[in-house]
From Swiss-Prot:
InterPro entries linked: PPIase_dom_sf (IPR046357), PPIase_FKBP_dom (IPR001179), Trig_fac (IPR005215), Trigger_fac_C (IPR008880), Trigger_fac_C_sf (IPR037041), Trigger_fac_ribosome-bd_bac (IPR008881), Trigger_fac_ribosome-bd_sf (IPR036611), Trigger_fact/SurA_dom_sf (IPR027304)
PPIase FKBP-type domain location: 185-270
Main enzyme class: isomerase
Name used for this protein in its record: Trigger factor
GO CC terms: cytoplasm
Disulphide bridges: none
Keywords from the named record: Cell cycle, Cell division, Chaperone, Cytoplasm, Isomerase, Rotamase
Organism: Wolbachia pipientis wMel
Reaction equation(s) it catalyzes: [protein]-peptidylproline (omega=180) = [protein]-peptidylproline (omega=0)
One MF term in the entry's GO annotations: peptidyl-prolyl cis-trans isomerase activity
Lineage per the UniProt record: Bacteria, Pseudomonadati, Pseudomonadota, Alphaproteobacteria, Rickettsiales
UniProt family annotation: Belongs to the FKBP-type PPIase family. Tig subfamily.
């Protein structure tokens, strides 16, 4: 090994020496030096291995002159040796300084030996930077007391729910008055045709089509043209499709429309409760009441669960403190900003998420909580599958993308550990009204 070793270093082995550059909480930086003699020896050994099978025009495999092997493969051999040397020295150093686990090691090459010269200045020197994993405390269940909020469903809550159904599914009746002019909120049964340069375009015509004025079903301006029309009336008008219209062939195009109003229906009050129920598919009003109670109950359960989870998360964030790996926090912050857009407090929220994830990982290990296939599939189905994104597509992405796998597994572990903790800790029941529960939820 070369005698030209930097001062203030610690001799570790016959292969390398190291010098501590900085230690800041979880961050470590070291300068590692490997003598040129060692590198040359390893490069020569690698070249001899290559020579055994090297091929070149005019020479059989393994018969290439050694000087040609050196000329053709020296850089490849050096790269191979440098990579192996970095792996060995970095791993060995971490064992020596007793770093049990680390995150995202970074290597910066400072100097490489010049294999073409015989000198003592050609040591291989690189800087190793990494973060160690922090010592994470175990969550103490005995110290946690949460509020278990229960909402009492009253008659007024059921009435409000059914009133919302009336608004969504109004009771329409035909207008016989030939002089009646259609207005917002009315339902019109129409025939229409749309033409561009005198040609019908795809999807531009229909018979007995129902349109609610004010609903925005058609392109901007279409329903405005129908306002004021009478039953049996026909109207011709021009409209321009928006430049960003989803059908590219129609975007920005001017169209000629012809519309005939076949029928006008206006909303009217239901005659009795059973009529309300039947209008949306229930046999009688009592079944609608039961449906309303269930729907309100389900909504309250969802809000209650989110509230108690937030209370738990806030408690853990406030009562457990330890150093966080800055690289992981930075990655989480970038992921959040990519999904949600720039946030003023994204750094703080990223730190909270990383802290909770580490607390949950530690807790799951201590309490032997492991994920099942169903846990992972549940997250995929509930979080990522939608009418626009099919299950098979998400599953394929999960199987092929390691980063997405880690994200989904992390979410699944969070849900499982959170449910476990909430079940085990002390809880104080609090009865509130449905309105009060909604206010608490809206203030999250």
């Amino acid at each position: 090994m070369s005698n030209n070793i930097p001062q203030n270093t610690v001799e570790v082995s016959s292969v390398y020496t190291y010098k501590e550059l900085s230690i800041d909480k979880l961050k470590y930086e070291y300068e590692i030096t490997v003598g040129s003699d060692y590198i040359k020896q390893k490069v020569n050994s690698r070249l001899q291995e290559i020579a055994e099978n090297a091929k070149s025009p005019g020479f059989r495999a393994g018969k290439m002159p050694y000087d040609l092997v050196v000329a053709n493969y020296k850089n490849e051999a050096l790269e191979y040796v440098i990579n192996n040397t970095i792996d060995y020295c970095s791993s060995d150093l971490m064992k020596k300084i007793e770093v049990k686990s680390h995150i995202y090691p970074k290597v910066d090459v400072i100097s490489l030996p010049d294999l073409g010269k015989e000198n003592e200045e050609g040591n291989f020197v690189y800087k190793l930077s990494f973060e160690s994993m922090p010592e994470v405390p175990v969550i103490d269940l005995d110290k946690i007391n949460l509020k278990k909020i229960e909402a009492k469903i009253e008659e007024e809550d059921i009435k409000e729910f059914i009133d919302s159904i009336k608004t969504k599914f109004p009771n329409f009746a035909s207008v016989d008055d030939a002089s009646y002019q259609a207005k917002d909120g009315d339902k019109l049964i129409i025939d229409f045709e749309g033409r561009i340069r005198n040609k019908l375009f795809q999807g531009g015509s229909s018979k007995n089509f129902a349109v609610n004025l004010g609903s925005g079903t058609f392109i901007n301006g279409f329903e405005d043209q129908l306002t004021g029309m009478k039953k049996g009336e026909t109207k011709n008008f021009k409209l321009k499709f928006p430049e960003n219209y989803q059908a590219i062939s129609l975007a920005g195009q001017e169209a000629d429309f012809s519309v005939r109003v076949n029928e006008i229906q206006i909303a009217k009050d239901f005659e009795n409760d059973d009529e309300i129920a039947k209008s949306i598919g229930f046999k009688d009003y009592s079944l609608l009441i039961n449906h309303a109670k269930k729907m309100i109950g389900d909504q309250c359960t969802e809000m209650r669960n989110l509230l108690i989870k937030k209370e738990l998360f806030d408690y853990l964030d406030a009562n457990y403190s330890f150093d966080l790996p800055t690289d992981i926090v930075k990655q989480e912050q970038q992921r959040m900003e990519g999904e949600l857009g720039a946030q003023n407090d994204s750094r703080k929220e990223a730190e909270k998420r990383v802290k909770l994830a580490m607390l949950f990982m530690k807790f799951s290990a201590e309490h032997k909580i492991s994920l099942t296939q169903n846990d992972v599939l549940s997250v995929i189905v509930n979080q990522y599958v939608s009418k626009d994104v099919q299950f098979d597509r998400v599953l394929k992405h999960f199987e092929s993308n390691k980063q997405f796998q880690e994200l989904v597994r992390g979410q699944a572990l969070e849900y499982k550990v959170t449910d476990y903790i909430i079940e085990k800790v002390s809880k104080e029941e609090q009865i509130v009204s449905v309105k009060e529960l909604k206010e608490l939820f809206d203030n999250i």
